[in-house]
Amino acid sequence: MLNLTKDKRKSLGSFYTPDSLADKMVRKFKSLEGNFVDFTAGDGSLLRALNRAGVDWSRLYANELDKSSYENLLKMNPDLPRDHVLNMDALDDECHKKMLEITGGQYQVILNPPFSKANKIVSKILEFMPE
């Protein structure tokens, strides 16, 4: 898990998803086919849960806004292709346009967004999510 101070996590609204919860979230998917995106990836716990469930790293994509969290995400998930990871604001249209581009326009979303921005982030994802 990240070595961020409690104050830093609070300022980011960041509380990383425990493995047990991540695994439960993954089990709720009807299908594990296709690509998966976590727009608020943190340390990548949801991506690792998908991988544990059999989803190949080549079908996993991530975005993380905070630079130190982004760098830690890359370190903690060495099998995640680097060109599948963005360091952008999930509330920015450009983040979603870039994700559509790198995924080929097809993906399912898994995320546990910062509580303080959850509604805005989910609304933005729905605006750009492929049908």
List the predicted regions and their residue ranges:
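Class I S-adenosyl-L-methionine-dependent methyltransferase catalytic core
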Residues: 1-131
